[in-house]
Amino acid sequence: AESSAMKFQRQHMDPEGSPSNSSNYCNVMMIRRNMTQGRCKPVNTFVHESLADVQAVCFQKNVLCKNGQTNCYQSYSRMRITDCRVTSSSKFPNCSYRMSQAQKSIIVACEGDPYVPVHFDASVEPST
């Protein structure tokens, strides 16, 4: 079975990716990463930084998760991300996404040993 850590990497990591060259990025990636099986995943964020940099966030600023759990961490620095949101006209199995790019601080939930990201919680403006 796929571990939570591996699922996080499949759903959220694309270190080499630079979607700027293609408005089709989300449509291709959501299929390639198996997020359109059974339904169109409504929202997904890809992070274009190294796995080491994203894993390091687990040792950065401890913040509350959206669900109230305490194992979320916010990156000190901005990271390059792409948000993919399903379009309102999208009908499974023809999932269609619109893409927006940003450089924001990311918030991830971490667990396990080694302590690694298992859930992408949010992206926010870095706190000052």
Swiss-Prot record:
Keywords: Disulfide bond, Endonuclease, Glycoprotein, Hydrolase, Lyase, Nuclease, Secreted
Catalytic reaction list: an [RNA] containing cytidine + H2O = an [RNA]-3'-cytidine-3'-phosphate + a 5'-hydroxy-ribonucleotide-3'-[RNA]; an [RNA] containing uridine + H2O = an [RNA]-3'-uridine-3'-phosphate + a 5'-hydroxy-ribonucleotide-3'-[RNA]
Disordered, as annotated region: 1-21
Domain of life: Eukaryota
GO CC annotations, alphabetized: extracellular region
Tissue expression as described in the entry: Pancreas.
Active-site residues, record numbering mapped to chain: H12 (proton acceptor), H119 (proton donor)
GO function terms (MF aspect): lyase activity; nucleic acid binding; ribonuclease A activity
GO biological process: defense response to Gram-positive bacterium
Family the entry assigns: Belongs to the pancreatic ribonuclease family.
Record protein name field: Ribonuclease pancreatic B
Native organism: Cavia porcellus
